[in-house]
Swiss-Prot record:
Source species: Escherichia coli O127:H6 (strain E2348/69 / EPEC)
Function comment: Catalyzes the NADPH-dependent reduction of glutamyl-tRNA(Glu) to glutamate 1-semialdehyde (GSA).
Database matches in PROSITE patterns: GLUTR (PS00747)
Quaternary data: Homodimer.
Protein name: Glutamyl-tRNA reductase
Keyword Calcium (UniProt): no
């Protein structure tokens, strides 16, 4: 039995190839059935995200294993093998275990240390268990990878610092306000970045969010998801005074929030502080706003400096995480080898017990027929000894004939000979 990890990701293949190799959720069961129908595959998990498609397999070793699996993948997706081969990576046993642990821990992600991948790996594993998981070794490898990912998160700072603009904006807000549950947040725009910001804020228990956008329909979809109120851009001047935090990211060529607008809002708020985070390029907030007392303005460049600093911290934490992964992968493979040895030990003991029971039964039958007890016991001891040492003796003789001193020494050690 061999453990394998093979696939492509954002580092080895462009999106034009990744999208052709991806497995859609509605066809995943069919793909797993097809994969497990391959004679060499004992168990399999398919991980398919926007940045990677990977197969994790428990397989029987054979000479054409790699070619057979590449051929299956290409046939399933109607791909030319040459198109895929140069982008495909292949990891076996310890390297496969280490790769999965790195993926689950966010060490192989586009954004170093991002936590979402662990949930995606867990879902891929759960999907495989719906009648598809047949290999206990593969199941144990995934369960171990989940605990390693948790250990990496607990023992290192790999996920402690923001490395995306959206996450950095939310982190900044959490640093300035003791609790986000009591603040009002105004989000300007409804694009991808604002969507991420809104979801982060919801996770941190923000109770009141207002979304201002040029088109109400797009904003309403996001508002329904996060429980926010939708207003028009033209309503910002009137509603700005309610906001403790303003995060803006639109494609407007001109500023949406001016100095005068913020001055009026601060006056209505009796100069309670406001945090303004302008993620847009060109800027949505006039730079002069930053000169106002109690208005704390951060631009996308300010966030980038935070992100650069945090990324350096994550890279340092990744070194610690890699050490954890290497240690855990080594220990898992030692456990796997022990499991393989235990099966051999069980077979050996079963064989010896069978010989013992067979010869003991014959000896007892002879005693019941009135045979000489001493002679019967001596015969039992002689036959039992010969039967038990027969196979090791043949192995020693063969090693001697072959001049294989290394094997001779291994056999001597196994038999406890000094």
């Amino acid at each position: 039995m061999t453990l394998l990890a093979l696939g492509i990701n954002h580092k080895t293949a462009p999106v034009s190839l990744r999208e052709r190799v991806s497995f859609s959720p509605d066809k995943l069961d069919q793909a797993l059935d097809s994969l497990l129908a391959q004679p060499m595959v004992q168990g399999g998990v398919v991980l398919s995200t926007c940045n990677r498609t990977e197969l994790y397999l428990s397989v029987e070793e054979r000479d054409d294993l790699q070619e057979a699996l590449i051929r299956w993948l290409c046939d399933y997706h109607n791909l030319n093998e040459d198109d895929l081969r140069n982008s495909l990576y292949w990891h076996q046993d310890n390297d496969a275990v280490s790769h999965l642990m790195r993926v689950a821990s966010g060490l192989d992600s586009l954004v170093l240390g991002e936590p979402q991948i662990l949930g995606q790996v867990k879902k891929a594993f759960a999907d495989s268990q719906k009648g598809h998981m047949k290999a206990s070794e593969l199941e144990r490898m995934f369960q171990k990878s989940f605990s390693v990912a948790k250990r990496v998160r607990t023992e290192t700072d790999i996920g402690a610092s923001a490395v995306s603009v959206a996450f950095a904006a939310c982190t900044l807000a959490r640093q300035i306000f003791e609790s986000l549950s009591t603040v009002t947040v105004l989000l300007v725009g409804a694009g991808e970045t604002i969507e991420l910001v809104a979801r982060h804020l919801r996770e941190h228990k923000v109770q009141k969010m207002i979304i201002a956008n040029r088109t109400r329909e797009r904003a309403q979809i996001l508002a329904d998801e996060v429980g926010a109120e939708v207003i028009a851009l033209s309503d910002i001047d009137e509603r700005l005074r309610e906001a403790d935090i303003i995060i803006s990211s639109t494609a407007s060529p001109l500023p949406i929030i001016g100095k005068g607008m913020v001055e009026r809002a601060l006056k209505s708020r009796r100069n309670q502080p406001m945090l303004l985070v302008d993620i847009a390029v060109p800027r949505d907030v006039e730079p002069e706003v930053g000169k106002l007392a109690n208005a704390y303005l951060y631009s996308v460049d300010d966030l980038q400096s935070i992100i650069s600093h945090n990324l350096a911290q994550r890279k340092a934490a990744a070194v610690e995480a890699e050490t954890i992964v290497a240690q855990e992968a080594s220990e898992f493979m030692a456990w796997l080898r022990a499991q393989s040895a235990s099966e051999t030990i069980r077979d050996y003991r079963s064989q010896a017990e069978h010989v013992r029971d067979e010869l003991t039964a014959k000896a007892l039958a002879a005693l019941e027929q009135g045979g000489d007890a001493q002679a019967i016991m001596q015969d039992l001891a002689w036959k039992l000894t010969n039967r038990l040492i027969h196979a090791p003796t043949k192995s020693l003789q063969q090693a001697a004939r072959d001049g294989d001193n290394e094997r001779l020494n291994i056999l001597r050690d196994s038999l406890g000979l000094e």
